[in-house]
Amino acid sequence: MDFTPTQEQAAAQELAARIFGDLATHERLSAAGTGSDPELWKALCGAGLVGAVQEVGLLGLVLLLEEQGRTTAQVPFAATCVYGLLAVSAHGSAEQRERLLPGITDGSVVVGGGFPAQGGVRASARGEPPAGHQQGVQAPHQQGVRAPRQQGVRDPHQQDVRPSTHAELTGTVPVVPWLRDATHVLVADADRNLWLVRAGDAEWQPVELTAPWAAGRLVLDGAEAEQLGGSDAYADVLATARTAFAGLQAGVCAGSLARAVAHTNTREQFGRPLATKQAVQLRAADAYMDTEAIRVTAYEAAWRRDTGLACTSHALTAAWWASEAGRRVVHTGQHLHGGAGADLDHPVHRHFLWGRQLDAYLGCGDELLQELGELIKEGEEVDAWDR
């Protein structure tokens, strides 16, 4: 295991830190409200950072997302790189790569994802409509994405229908982060096939989340979609998403802790800085250890994927740390600010909101542990990169 950044990864991280630091200021973030920052997105794409992910790999992306998390910059960087750039690069056909990748790298194509993790937002197939419902009609209180069976092609040697490369999807994805900015959305059906839908071919309504992620509710009613990859694509993209968003959480926690350290070093009580108090030191130390645990597990999962090793369980581990420990860290960051931490306009409150949102997005810690336990019980990882 060697997490030492390559020269290219270090250069990309340094450039990202400079751009995020210059443009994702407290004043600009406050002015943006719950929307994204188009000027910052243009700067990132113009600097070649989105396209650079193809060269620096998932570990490089984790490093870049750490810098985004430190500043809580409101751009669809993680979603576009995970559900767009890396997914299309790894699983798209030659025609899909040629058609989609140029737009993704220059920022004109923004991709959202409808299935981040177990226990979070996920699209699943419903199968055939229940009795009394017409084809393509969503039953009340049932959500998910269904790829109609007749859209497939029948294999004469098999009883089942294998999906064609195009289908019409019906269903609802309750929350898709950055949907308001997206030109495409990647969703999964119950058979874990991935489908790429043009946002303009679907209906959506804005949804406000804990963090300002420009989210929306995606409604698919016979929307045309193209399949991305084969049966192994779902597991890889899911593991990639868990790893990447864990890296984003590591940055959010690092930013929250850095603000808490600065505050407690300058704020005095009874003539002494708050940082000299033992209770403050212990809480800050615990938060630091939690942040490092998130970081190192995300690094390991990313490194394993980049080197072609099994990473499913490692991505789950990173997601668990990001969910459970991340929540502890952002609470600590707010608590160490005392009364100032309760101010909704204080910069540290933004880290608190992002940390809680990532906690929810990655999924409940108990469910992640259950999934990890089932994987360990099976005794092996089903991972396309080992084949």
Predicted segments with their positions:
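Anion-binding (especially nucleotide phosphate/pyrophosphate-binding) glycine-rich loop
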Residues: Q68, A73, G84
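Amphipathic alpha-helical segments in well-structured domains
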Residues: L58-V62, C81, R97
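FAD-binding core of flavoproteins
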Residues: P102-A258, W385-R387
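Alpha-helical interface subdomain recognition
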Residues: M1-G69, G107, H133-P148, G152-H157, ...
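Amphipathic alpha-helical regulatory segments at dimerization interfaces
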Residues: R18, D22, A43, A90, ...
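Signature of the chorismate-utilizing enzyme
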Residues: E55, V75-P76
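Short secondary-structure capping/junction motifs at helix and strand boundaries
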Residues: V75, A94-L101, V110-G112
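N-terminal glycine-rich flavin-associated loop
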Residues: P76-A94
